[in-house]
């Protein structure tokens, strides 16, 4: 009945939590350290899950106790969680079946999620396809010199994708987080995987990160939002010199 935990301090305070969801950055060293701390204080009746979007369960559970492994799974909620119905679940062969059944029932009937059961592979289903598509679209758009707002209009509603497109979605997710996501894919995928052709962050992304531009949560990214006379004003980035400019809504005749 209450939303629990934005930090480990809250976990210590809520040792009676029925379900603890880990949602830290996509770095396995940080996750392993957090799991070790959670295992010391959690209720033996609790379920622990990760909101990872890319890291396989076999990697997440490498340093876990057997008891925690039996209570651990992946619950990948899609962003924004309050609107997106999709929920990917990956479970271990040793996961407590009664707890897993209860978790599925809660997610479907109380949270209103549509559950997709996934194999334990990098990126599961959604991000294995989606992140690859984003990377290909980004590389193609930048290579062809497409303005970001034009690229997003093309890689958006016409393809049945949210209007954020690729560059807007990068800003929404966080450019720094996307770099961690790509690093995770690079570590786990085989060298002959087609994803490896586009898994490296684009040089423009590296330049943005060097300037501290992480997307919506920072001073800007491929778009920059400012407040003008109390109203939000969005500018697009010129990818050739990283300056920002005003733009009109793109209306494609498709």
Question: How should each PLM-predicted stretch be described?
Answer:
Residues 1-12:
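Single conserved hydrophobic/aromatic residue that forms the stacking wall/gate
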Residues 2, 23, 52, 77-80, ...:
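Generic detector of well-ordered alpha-helical packing
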Residues 11, 28-29, 97, 219:
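Loop/helix-junction capping segments adjacent to catalytic residues or to phosphate/diphosphate-binding pockets
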Residues 13-66, 70-71:
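Rossmann-fold NAD(P) dinucleotide-binding segment
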Residues 47-128, 163, 230, 245-248, ...:
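Rossmann-fold dinucleotide-binding core
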Residues 90, 116-254:
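Substrate-binding/catalytic subdomain of NAD(P)-dependent oxidoreductase enzymes
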């Amino acid at each position: 009945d209450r939303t629990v935990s934005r930090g480990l301090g809250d976990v210590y305070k809520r040792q009676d939590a029925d379900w603890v969801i880990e949602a830290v950055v996509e770095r396995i060293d940080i996750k392993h350290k957090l799991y070790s701390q959670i295992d010391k204080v959690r209720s033996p009746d609790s379920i622990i899950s990760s909101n990872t979007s890319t890291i396989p369960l076999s990697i997440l559970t490498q340093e876990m106790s057997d008891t925690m492994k039996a209570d651990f799974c992946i619950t990948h909620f899609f962003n924004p969680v309050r609107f997106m119905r999709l929920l990917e679940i990956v479970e271990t062969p040793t996961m407590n079946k009664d707890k897993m059944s209860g978790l599925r029932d809660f997610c479907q009937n109380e949270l209103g999620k549509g559950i997709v059961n996934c194999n334990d592979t990098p990126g599961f289903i959604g991000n294995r396809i989606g992140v690859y598509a984003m990377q290909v679209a980004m590389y193609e758009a930048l290579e062809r010199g497409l303005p970001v707002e034009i690229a997003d209009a093309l890689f958006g509603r016409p393809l049945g994708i949210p209007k954020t497109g690729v560059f807007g979605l990068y800003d929404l997710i966080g450019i720094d987080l996307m770099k961690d996501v790509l690093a995770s894919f690079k570590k786990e995928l085989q060298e002959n995987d087609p994803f490896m052709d586009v898994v490296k962050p684009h040089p423009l992304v590296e330049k943005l990160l060097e300037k501290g531009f992480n997307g919506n949560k920072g001073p800007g990214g491929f778009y920059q939002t400012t407040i003008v006379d109390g109203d939000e004003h969005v500018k697009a980035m010129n990818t050739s010199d990283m300056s920002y400019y005003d733009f009109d809504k793109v209306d494609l005749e498709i």
